[in-house]
Amino acid sequence: MKIIITALLFAIVMPSFAQRENEHNKHDMEKMEQFLPSVTRSIGGSFQQFDGLNARVANLPQYEHLKDYTATLGLGWMKEKDRFISDMGITIGSSLSRHRDEKSSTIRYIGFNANAGYDVLKDERITLYPLVGIGFQAYQAIFYKDNSAVDFDDVLQSPAVENSIHPVKFNNGFWVYRAGLGLSFKSPKHPSSSIGLQAGYTGSFQKRAWRSRENQSLRNAPKDRISQFYVSLILTSKPWMMMKK
């Protein structure tokens, strides 16, 4: 009899404890959500001309000039509080124009940036925000030659010939400022996620000379500056540990 009574009391009390535990966990998650930023993923493109480096290549028929576009991917975080918006991220870009067996060139870069903005709309589903920021972008330009006429035995027997078929690489890096505009939309069914666009301009504070692949300074090296327009599709969601409440 005592066992039966104990079992009944246990069955009555346990749901109450479970409910309190769920409410406590829900409260903790809501509190955590106020402080943790959202994760951002982006895909897009940027447009930039390197006139200084291209001018040097123009008179060398064995090399192809650099493209003025890059495809980009990004990963970062974004936080909105009291309509103030802050975000940080990493962006990689490439012109995707490399052909190892043909005369070609490619430009690629990695960038780090931090931005701040302000939501000018008082709307729960739509966010419109101008933003400004700073960052750093590191570039590598690679030039490939058509080596199809080079004989295999010549490469095998001559270190000079072997070195001559290597692609030519130059590096550069720029501290940059950023200014742009963002627009995002939240779904009523998924208010913790959003989809949106960012577009803007990135400029460098000064011109920088191109360096060797080992980042050595070179005499009479051409100089360029960043004057870049960009546009990105941005997907935003809360961190994975908060996807289920």
Q: Which sequence ranges carry the predicted segments?
A:
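Outer-membrane beta-barrel domain signature
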Residues: 60-66, 101-105, 119, 166-172, ...
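Outer-membrane beta-barrel translocator domains and adjoining extracellular loop/strand segments
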Residues: 51-59, 97-105, 141-149, 207-216
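Predominantly the C-terminal beta-signal and adjacent terminal strand-loop region
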Residues: 174, 179-245
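Short glycine/proline- and aromatic-enriched beta-strand/turn motifs that initiate or cap beta-hairpins
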Residues: 19-82, 234-238, 245
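Residues that define the transmembrane beta-barrel architecture of outer-membrane proteins
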Residues: 37, 67-73, 106-112, 126, ...
